[in-house]
Amino acid sequence: MDIQKLDQTYIAGTYARFPVTIVKGKGSLVWDENGKEYIDLSTGIAVDIFGVADEQWMAAVTKQLGTLQHISNLYYTEPCAKLAQLLCEKTGMKKVFFGNSGAEANECAIKAARKWSEDKKGKEYSTIITLKNSFHGRTITTLAATGQDVFHHDFLPLTEGFVYAEPNDLADLARLIAENKCAAVMMEVVQGEGGVMPLDEAYVKGAAKLCQENDLLLICDEVQIGNGRSGMLYGYMAYGVQPDIVSTAKGLAGGLPLGATLLGEKVQNVLSAGTHGSTFGGNPVCCAGAINVLERLDEAMLQGVQARSAYIKQELTGAKGVIGVSGLGLMLGIQTEKNAADIIAACREKGVLVIKAKDKLRLLPALNIPMDQLAKAIAVIKECCAG
């Protein structure tokens, strides 16, 4: 069977796929239909955070699958409640809403912020400030929140009520707060699709202070950098701020679709019965996977992330053909002299899977990738950058 032809015939043309059909994997290794082995540094775009077919994760998921796969949010289930407890205890947040994706987590964050602001200040205080170069999802509202025009074309009109601030410019943020009737400021502490660009610590702390002074909510989008990838449990923790709302997804359930919106003290009770919902959100199987993930993201695991990050930066900074390395933890962007797409293709030929963010290589390896496999992959990247 020609899988690629079948896909091209029946799947909507929304993806420019690489010419590879992946059929199986184990840990940080995957194999294509011809039996070729690859070291995977993309992990399904930061989803398979313990790699493919992780034994502990599979055991947790299959145990739940044999008990109850779905029942809806009309009933109580243990995995959903236990996962919410874990998230709150590990972050200091108060309540959780579960959806299925990062876009859904951000939609909930936006709804919660607007309802809080309307309840407290009035309906007109609905504007949410996001950052230029940001990415918050592909629904009409999260596209509106995304501060990149390239994603807006063909889908106008977008949801109203968003304005965009210059990253790392507190004066511009203060100006927008003064000029608009605002509910919240929403940011990724590391802009992923925007080129793996971490915000300055002084800016994030300054933004949090501006929110406090102006009675605005601070929303941190942790969809990609969250769940241990930064070397902390969540990326905002590296900046020493406490958001009012946190959105996360991708690696949360280790490979299953799950999004979460964490609500802090100010907004913990803003959503009441009927104000929001999800058919699949909090699915028991997905929650079982996420419980396994969170229970394993201990200090030793996070120190391992930091060590792997330091190794990659040490090896690639100053390497031939490498202009610079950006990012945090195991979410790294590599600026190269050669075209990034050409390097990605060359790496793939040599058995290493990497992806792009704007004009950079984007590295998103499993948090527990064996050091020998990581070293081999980085050697290939260096060779392809230099060649």
Segments from the language model and where they lie:
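Conserved N-terminal phosphate-binding loop of PLP-dependent enzymes in the Aspartate aminotransferase
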Residues: M1-G387
